Amino acid sequence: MSQQHTLPVTLPPALSQELLNTVPPPINTQQEQREQPVPLPPPCQKVPVELPVEGPSKHEEKHVTIVKGVPEHECEQQQQAQGQERQQQHWGQNKEHQKAGNPEQQLKQEEAQREKQQLQGQLEEEKKLLDQQLDQELAKRDDQLGTKKKQLLEFPEQQEGQLKHLEQQEKPLELPEQQSGQPKYLEQQEGQLKHLEEQKGQLKHLEQQEGQLELPEQVDQPKHLEQLEKQLEHPEQQEGKLKKLEEEEEQLKHLEQQEEQLKHLEQQEGQLEHLEQQEGELKHLEQCEGQLEHLEQQEGQLELPEQQVGQSKHLEQEEKQLEHPEQQEGQLKHLGKQEAQLELPEQVGQPKHLEQQEKQLEHPEQQEEQQEGQLKDLEQQERQLEQPVFAPAPGQAQDIQQALPSKGEVLLPVDQQQQKQEVQWQQK
């Protein structure tokens, strides 16, 4: 360390300013001591200087000037700037070294810096929004207080006018003659006075409340700002709160969707119940229709056997009549036709037979008459069969046997006739 030398020098103000302007920047003291043999004061050293003052003065003023170059605050600024430059150079070298060595760390650092910048931008925006909200709230409170003050200022004037009016009314009431004649009026005035006193108390209470409102605004504002700053210092907590709020909103939306689905399911259940009722009604109707069809079939079956029984009896009677040789030739053809109709009703005579049955069903009276006629014919045929049969001569019997086949051979021409009838129906 170099030794400090203080020399008292008295200079005029003009010379002191020239010295300050012309002094070169500071240099390391060790180099100066080596190069210059003459000892000089070190940099940034205070030197007392006596400056002349106009006019007679008992006490001489002493001024302290810096001998070499630069004042203290400028030296400190220069030293700080040099230190910052060295730090920046050192940081730049470290960054270059890191870039050359670890590109992954560089990317991570850049991402971290971007995230920090984004968070800082978000925090600044939130601060602006909060400041705007605070300004709006303060403006609203100021408006409310202004309106209350106006009301309070207007209200005392009205009260003062009422008090004066009451005082004027009380003066004539002091007379004993008037007091004795106006008791009700006095009671009314006393009530008004009590009401005015209550209003005064309310005014005082309102004034106290205004004072309390004005103070908390000033007290609570810094607390509120501190809370906001703390919140801004912890963005992670804010992000967690935001995530929680988003999750709660999603849960609410999910619950609303579930409620809508439940309502839709309830509607579908009602529709299903209605459909089940309709299906039950349809099944009941189908059962009724099946019962009706079954009844119709039974009716048809009941009507057909009567005709078939009558026809079978008629055929038996005709076969018996065929035993008579005189009637066999004319009745064989008739029997063949009837047997063909009875054996093949589905292929040959179904449409006509059905039409006849429908007509008969439409006219039951005619059917009964026909049945009665058939019964009469059958009775006549039975009577004919009961009559004795005369045996023919031997020559005639041979002729008859040659002309007419036996009972077993009667079916052959009937089958041929059935085949002929089928061919005729197909051609038609």
UniProtKB/Swiss-Prot annotation:
<dbReference type="InterPro" id="IPR019571">
    <property type="entry name" value="Involucrin_N"/>
</dbReference>
<feature type="compositionally biased region" description="Basic and acidic residues">
    <location>
        <begin position="220"/>
        <end position="297"/>
    </location>
</feature>
<feature type="compositionally biased region" description="Basic and acidic residues">
    <location>
        <begin position="107"/>
        <end position="117"/>
    </location>
</feature>
<comment type="subunit">
    <text>Directly or indirectly cross-linked to cornifelin (CNFN).</text>
</comment>
<dbReference type="InterPro" id="IPR019743">
    <property type="entry name" value="Involucrin_CS"/>
</dbReference>
<feature type="compositionally biased region" description="Basic and acidic residues">
    <location>
        <begin position="56"/>
        <end position="76"/>
    </location>
</feature>
<dbReference type="InterPro" id="IPR000354">
    <property type="entry name" value="Involucrin_rpt"/>
</dbReference>
<feature type="compositionally biased region" description="Basic and acidic residues">
    <location>
        <begin position="192"/>
        <end position="208"/>
    </location>
</feature>
<dbReference type="GO" id="GO:0031424">
    <property type="term" value="P:keratinization"/>
</dbReference>
<feature type="compositionally biased region" description="Basic and acidic residues">
    <location>
        <begin position="374"/>
        <end position="385"/>
    </location>
</feature>
<dbReference type="GO" id="GO:0001533">
    <property type="term" value="C:cornified envelope"/>
</dbReference>
<keyword id="KW-0963">Cytoplasm</keyword>
<protein>
    <recommendedName>
        <fullName>Involucrin</fullName>
    </recommendedName>
</protein>
<comment type="similarity">
    <text>Belongs to the involucrin family.</text>
</comment>
<dbReference type="GO" id="GO:0018149">
    <property type="term" value="P:peptide cross-linking"/>
</dbReference>
<dbReference type="Pfam" id="PF00904">
    <property type="entry name" value="Involucrin"/>
</dbReference>
<dbReference type="GO" id="GO:0005737">
    <property type="term" value="C:cytoplasm"/>
</dbReference>
<dbReference type="GO" id="GO:0010224">
    <property type="term" value="P:response to UV-B"/>
</dbReference>
<feature type="region of interest" description="Disordered">
    <location>
        <begin position="140"/>
        <end position="398"/>
    </location>
</feature>
<keyword id="KW-0417">Keratinization</keyword>
<dbReference type="Pfam" id="PF10583">
    <property type="entry name" value="Involucrin_N"/>
</dbReference>
<feature type="compositionally biased region" description="Low complexity">
    <location>
        <begin position="209"/>
        <end position="218"/>
    </location>
</feature>
<feature type="compositionally biased region" description="Low complexity">
    <location>
        <begin position="77"/>
        <end position="92"/>
    </location>
</feature>
<dbReference type="GO" id="GO:0030216">
    <property type="term" value="P:keratinocyte differentiation"/>
</dbReference>
<comment type="function">
    <text>Part of the insoluble cornified cell envelope (CE) of stratified squamous epithelia.</text>
</comment>
<feature type="compositionally biased region" description="Low complexity">
    <location>
        <begin position="298"/>
        <end position="311"/>
    </location>
</feature>
<feature type="region of interest" description="Disordered">
    <location>
        <begin position="1"/>
        <end position="128"/>
    </location>
</feature>
<feature type="compositionally biased region" description="Basic and acidic residues">
    <location>
        <begin position="352"/>
        <end position="366"/>
    </location>
</feature>
<feature type="compositionally biased region" description="Basic and acidic residues">
    <location>
        <begin position="313"/>
        <end position="327"/>
    </location>
</feature>
<feature type="compositionally biased region" description="Basic and acidic residues">
    <location>
        <begin position="162"/>
        <end position="174"/>
    </location>
</feature>
<keyword id="KW-0677">Repeat</keyword>
